[in-house]
Amino acid sequence: CEEKALEGVAVYREYFDRQGIFENRVYPGIEGMLDGLKRQGCRLLVATSKPETAAVRVLEHFGLSGYFAYIGGATLDDSRVRKGDVIRYVLESCGIREKAQAVMVGDREQDVKGAKENGLEVVGVLYGYGSREELVGAGADYLVESPQGLVHLLMK
């Protein structure tokens, strides 16, 4: 059974690497939001549960990688897969020790929990995959409904 599972994972990873990686889209307003935040002097970082190599490829494919000072993600050898571990890795890699200097923006429960585990405030975005109930239940500090709402909140 374990051998079949490993075969399945290998088939999925091969498909994902070949074409599945790009089977998504950028939400409307995201590029304008990133541009606006960067112009306002925000240092933008990525902490994703996707494999780091895949995250870089996706952001480059959609022309968004230039907005980010650092792109961090999970490892392919499973040594860093938990969201809290990825966030910690990004914070350490970027020399962020003062947690008040950073805020996590996410759309799922694991984003909120991983950020809280690292002492960060969290903005839950309602234009992603998670629901209001999921984000509130996980303990998000703020909720926004649009990329423009995120800019407004962060620039206060």
Locate the predicted segments by residue:
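Surface-exposed amphipathic alpha-helices with a cationic face
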Residues: 31-39, 91, 112-117
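Acidic, Mg2+-coordinating phosphoryl-transfer loop and its flanking beta/alpha structural elements
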Residues: 103-145
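Conserved Lys-Pro-Asp/Glu-containing loop-to-beta segment of HAD-superfamily phosphomonoesterases
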Residues: 83-113
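A short, structured active-site edge motif that brings together acidic residues
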Residues: 65-80
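Short beta->alpha linker loops
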Residues: 25-29, 50, 107, 127-130, ...
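Conserved H-loop
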Residues: 22, 65-69, 97
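Substrate-recognition element of Asp-dependent hydrolases with the DxDx(T/V) motif
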Residues: 33-59
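Metal-dependent phosphoesterase signature
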Residues: 1-32, 40-42, 100
